[in-house]
Each structure stands twice: as C-alpha cells, then as structure tokens.
Regions:
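Surface-exposed molecular-recognition determinants
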Residues: 1-175
Length: 175
C-alpha cells in the first residue's frame, strides 16, 4: 500500500446525530480509508451504518448492492458461530448500509473498525468498498459491496440506526 495521509478526524462530542465528511473526498487519492476508534452508541441494540452522496446530490440515498457476514462469540459464552446476515445486506437498496450491528451502550461497549472506499471520484465505474469491524459482542463483521453510480462521491455520512453517536472518532485517510 501507499502512504496514509490524514485528511480529517471527526470526534463525537457525545451528542452527534451523525458524523459526516463533506469535504476532502476528491481525485487526489484512489483509495480513502475511514478508521473508527471506540464508537459508542447512546442506546442499546444499535447498528452503525453509512451512506453517501454523489456530486450535486443530497439525502444520503445512493443505490448499493452489498454483502454482510460475521464471525461471533458472545461475551456471556451463550452463542458463537459464522453467519451470513441476509437482513443486513442490500440488493440495489438506498438505505444506510450496516457496518456493525447489535451495539450496546454499557460504559465499556464500543466498536472499532475500518471502511475502505475505492476511486470515489472516478466517473466511469461504480464505487467499490469493504469494511471490517469488531465490537463488545466479540463480533468480527465483514461488509463489502458497490455504490451503483458513475458520478463522483463527495460526501460520506455515518450514523446509528437510532439515537446518537455518544463517543469515539472517525479519521479519513487518503492512500
């Protein structure tokens, strides 16, 4: 890989509905990496997700096709396995794509992970991505897919399925 160049870090002040990167995504880099450190949910049973805007668009509702699977081992040792998450993938959907599910809000609960977005400024091809996350449930979640637009992607937003992001930071790097 190339040199990681930090572009921007967003840190939750404890009351964020979302964390949005609305500048810094351009043709300078062919790959953008988002690093999530100790993202904490306001309420239990939340899903951290993302969506994007194409150039000139709003609403964070671009069309995606995705996959989602996980290896898990419950903290209480009451469940373990490997599973494909049919309720978390999309087939040409416009919802926020789940990156980490079943997040809780206990004081020691958080998730950390990485999202890779490839060639977001390319105007010929769709935009590919993949992510890997871990959380207190001892879940290793893998998500991959593509954003079905040939328009440049200029904005990326992260939010919980309900409630606020209560802590943590997301850093965006160009590679």
């Amino acid at each position: 890989g190339g040199v990681w160049n930090l572009i921007q870090t967003l840190t939750s002040d404890g009351s964020d509905d979302d964390l949005s990167f609305t500048s810094g995504i351009d043709s300078t880099y062919d790959e953008y990496v988002f690093k999530f450190i100790n993202i904490h949910a306001e309420t239990s049973a939340q899903t951290l997700g993302f969506q994007v805007n194409a150039s000139g668009e709003s609403g964070y509702n671009e069309t995606m096709t995705t996959t989602d699977f996980r290896a898990y081992h419950a903290e209480a040792d009451d469940g373990a396995g490997l599973s494909y998450k049919t309720d978390m993938d999309q087939a040409q959907g416009t919802a926020f794509q789940a990156l980490m599910e079943e997040m809780n809000n206990n004081n020691d609960d958080s998730c950390s992970g990485t999202l890779h977005l490839f060639a977001p400024s390319d105007t010929t091809f769709v935009k590919h991505f993949f992510s890997r996350f871990s959380a207190e449930y001892v879940t290793d979640t893998f998500v991959a897919g593509y954003i079905n637009t040939t328009d440049a992607i200029t904005d990326v937003q992260f939010k919980m399925s309900s409630g606020e992001i209560q802590g943590g930071s997301i850093s965006m790097y160009g590679i």
